[in-house]
């Protein structure tokens, strides 16, 4: 779909359809008022008749409105004006796109970007409209023998901005939104791919393809043989029960090759399937453990968006690919592993494997002398209990970095919340036989997992994102969400000095 911005009067738009908002109860938005005035009260007379109340998501398609050049006008219910928030705005955009497709519109001019959304500017409204549109149109049906027929005639969508001086901002919002949407789609596709296909080697192949597509990207793959030489014993232990080789993919993006600035490093947990190993998970819902690689998928999606945007910064993405399976060679509860850092870990539960992969990856990235490291992982069920399915968890050893990430999450409407990491929590990880245990008991499970990782991130500024509750949805809407690609790209936009506000 083609997106663009313009600034003009609604009645003068020569388009198949123009889209304007109506608030509850039957209150016209400023743009709808303009059309009503031009049409001698035609729209308000329909509302008085009860054709549209203005409740969120209500739609009314009008034909041949007097004085209006557009063939059709789509009235969109936006709820109560003062209650129009971010979530409702995005839902309204998606419902609008669905209605435009259902009614056969090939092009439309959308004035919903002129609505007032509390605390949000034109850039945000246009970018979120692009992201929401792309997200609403996403499908994953490549494994269906008979593909569902969906009517999608809409090819061109124009967002109207209030003034001409906002056109550049709107165009930038579209550029950013399309790149982020592309990254989100790439992340979703990886997450939704079945585990018999999306194994660590598949992750590596996608990383190589990214390098083939962009001159600014290069890729290095580290297999088990090299891991053994590097002393990545903890990482290797997790994958021992699987016939699929563990592979770590290093994606290097050089947007500013002349710069001497230290790179930003993103590390993604890539458990392409997590059975729990010897500490086997319950059978119910185990199919969703293909999503245990969504951390790596989100890092991949972020790197793709970054390459599309051609940002002038240097970033390294690490996809820590592995599969946790039971088997005669699998690691066991009671094993003591010597990590790449030299620290030892007593394994109390083989289903707490993500941290055992990440700890060696975090040690490996020391060689890049990073400005900062952000790891992303579907790490703990405890995070779902703490924050539900709406907000990702943040744990960090560096206050400014955690503030940057939380701020980026607010800007991108991909929210995260910082959790504490006090010294007392480290007590739960004590082991009588090794330097630490790999679990710290039931209390504060997300925090103790973060504390574990922090022991391997002492040589740089580090933050951990626990996306166990936000990486995918269950039930009727089952599938990967692509989060937190939007947040990570926003973080990198901010780091590269890209202005995203008026």
UniProtKB/Swiss-Prot annotation:
Its EC number is 3.4.11.1, 3.4.11.10. The keyword DNA-binding does not apply. Mn(2+) 1 binds at residues 274, 351, 353. The keyword Hydrolase applies. Pfam families: Peptidase_M17, Peptidase_M17_N. The active site is at residues 281, 355. It catalyses: Release of an N-terminal amino acid, Xaa-|-Yaa-, in which Xaa is preferably Leu, but may be other amino acids including Pro although not Arg or Lys, and Yaa may be Pro. Amino acid amides and methyl esters are also readily hydrolyzed, but rates on arylamides are exceedingly low; Release of an N-terminal amino acid, preferentially leucine, but not glutamic or aspartic acids. GO terms for biological process: proteolysis. One of its GO terms (cellular component) is cytoplasm. Binds 2 manganese ions per subunit. It is found in: Cytoplasm. Mn(2+) 2 binds at residues 269, 274, 292, 353. Disulfide bonds: none annotated. InterPro entries: Leucine_aapep/pepB, Macro_dom-like, Peptidase_M17_C, Peptidase_M17_leu_NH2_pept, Peptidase_M17_N. Keywords: Aminopeptidase, Cytoplasm, Hydrolase, Manganese, Metal-binding, Protease. Its cofactor is Mn(2+). GO terms for molecular function: manganese ion binding; metalloaminopeptidase activity. It is an enzyme of class 3 (hydrolase). Belongs to the peptidase M17 family. HAMAP family: Cytosol_peptidase_M17 (MF_00181). Presumably involved in the processing and regular turnover of intracellular proteins. Catalyzes the removal of unsubstituted N-terminal amino acids from various peptides. NCBIfam families: PRK00913.1-1 (NF002072), PRK00913.1-2 (NF002073), PRK00913.1-4 (NF002074). This is Probable cytosol aminopeptidase. It comes from Vibrio campbellii (strain ATCC BAA-1116).
